[in-house]
A protein has these predicted regions:
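Bacterial Sec-dependent N-terminal signal peptides
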Residues: 1-37
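Cleft-lining beta-strand/loop regions that shape enzyme active-site pockets
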Residues: 2, 30-43, 47-64, 119-123, ...
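PDZ/PDZ-like peptide-tail recognition elements
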Residues: 82-122
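A generic structural motif
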Residues: 110, 171-175, 335, 350, ...
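Hydrophobic beta-strand signal
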Residues: 141-142, 318, 343, 358, ...
Length: 402
């Protein structure tokens, strides 16, 4: 009887302790929320007052769009490099990025790591770049009066693009001759050739090169694969080198060509659960046995890493090349007042083995490249057949070839 009373007494004490702990936790959370809200309102008030004084008594007249726009971009610069603000005049540029259409010279550019310069990698046939005589390997020295030395591809690209019909002076150095050349180029509307080439080698190995994951690219990849298969293809090389990504849905459709229906290829996870998504294969594949090699390099990013990493995790392809870029962050466009937009990072991508492809120690390094941590500090994951793969930034190839 006494034992039963003691047991009941202990239950009441434990219940009371749990209630006190729950209450204490709620008080702490409420206080943290209050502190956070106070910090937000305090800093907004300080910012408003600073600008008000600048506007009233600063020695020169300020351009509100320029000054406040710089403040917004400075705030976003402290976050990841993919959260970006687009005022009304720049929204069109964001839409062009999503559709694969833009105004520029029509050439692929890339960072030459040995030279530390941005070079022309491929002028598109019939483009302003091709008509001006630009060649693969040409080193970009300046655009108009802006020197491009030690600049990254994003910086150079932003200066090559502009309004249709505008002209600029491009200065390059041609390594094959050592000569410095200048040419005047007129920008015009460009539609990216996301699938510039596919073909069949004499040894019956097929080759498909995909430049970007723009809307509809999966249909062209599907058509190319079926055509090569009808021509006797016995193995496929799928080249994603230099592919900076694009539509995740298109990436899932391409992987779905080679893996069964109802497989979760990508999960997105972030702070708000209602914004989390699972991307599954939805149709039956067209081939599950064809040997496939996926080629990647340091400029293979985002949707390209979902494709190569998904094929690796499901043991459907061998990944060959160098470690990929490591962009595993999810962005969504958010409408802002006065027709502006915010491209906002809301979560991270996780591929079939449950690893995240985002570089863990991302930082704004010189040139915009990530700093990868050693494998000894990363976590192990398993592919479908039990092979060890790791997180820690991008996809590490099964076979490393530089």
């Amino acid at each position: 009887m006494a034992i039963e009373k003691n047991r009941n007494k202990m239950k009441r004490i434990l219940s009371a302790m749990l209630l006190v702990l729950a209450l204490a936790a709620s008080i702490v959370n409420a206080q943290e929320d209050k502190d956070h809200n106070f910090k937000v309102s305090k800093n907004i008030e300080v910012f408003n007052n600073i600008y008000r004084y600048l506007d009233m008594i600063y020695v020169d007249t300020l351009d509100a769009d320029e000054v406040i726009g710089s403040g917004i971009k400075g705030m976003l610069r402290s976050l990841d490099p993919y959260t970006e603000y687009y005022p009304e005049k720049e929204v069109k540029r964001l839409k062009n990025m999503l559709t694969g259409k833009y105004v520029g010279i029509g050439a692929v550019i890339r960072q030459n790591m040995k030279l530390g310069r941005v070079v022309i990698d491929e002028p598109y046939e019939g483009s302003p770049a091709a008509e001006a005589g630009l060649k693969k390997g040409d080193i970009i020295l300046s655009i108009n009066d802006t020197v491009m030395t030690d600049k990254n591809t994003a910086f150079v690209s932003s200066h090559l693009r502009g309004d249709p019909g505008t002209t600029f002076l491009l200065k390059i150095k041609r390594p094959s001759t050592g000569k410095t050349m200048q040419m005047r180029i007129t920008r015009r509307a460009i539609t990216l050739p996301y699938l510039p080439y596919y073909g069949l080698r004499p040894d019956s190995i097929g080759y498909i090169n995909l430049n970007s994951f723009t809307d509809g690219c999966s249909k062209d990849v599907r058509r190319a694969f079926i055509d090569l298969k009808h021509r006797g293809m016995k193995g496929l090389v799928f080249d994603l080198r230099g592919n900076g990504g694009g539509s995740v849905s298109e990436a899932v459709k391409i992987v779905n060509m080679f893996v069964p229906k109802d497989i979760t290829l990508v999960r997105t996870r972030g702070k708000m659960k209602r914004m989390n998504s699972d991307y599954k294969t939805t149709v039956e594949p067209i081939d599950t046995v064809m040997p496939i090699v996926v080629m990647v390099n340091g400029e293979t990013a985002s949707a390209s890493e979902i494709t190569s990493g998904g094929m690796q995790d499901l043991d459907r392809a061998v990944v060959l090349g160098t470690r990929t870029y490591g962009k595993g962050l999810v962005q969504v466009p958010v409408d802002l007042p006065y027709n502006g937009q915010l491209k906002l990072t809301t979560g991270k991508y996780y591929i079939p083995s449950n690893r995240c492809i985002q570089a863990i120690n991302y930082r704004h390094a010189r040139g915009g490249y990530t700093e990868h941590i050693p494998d000894s500090l990363t976590k192990e994951f398993r592919t479908r057949n039990g092979r060890i793969v790791r997180d820690g930034g991008g996809i590490k190839p099964d076979i490393e070839v530089k």
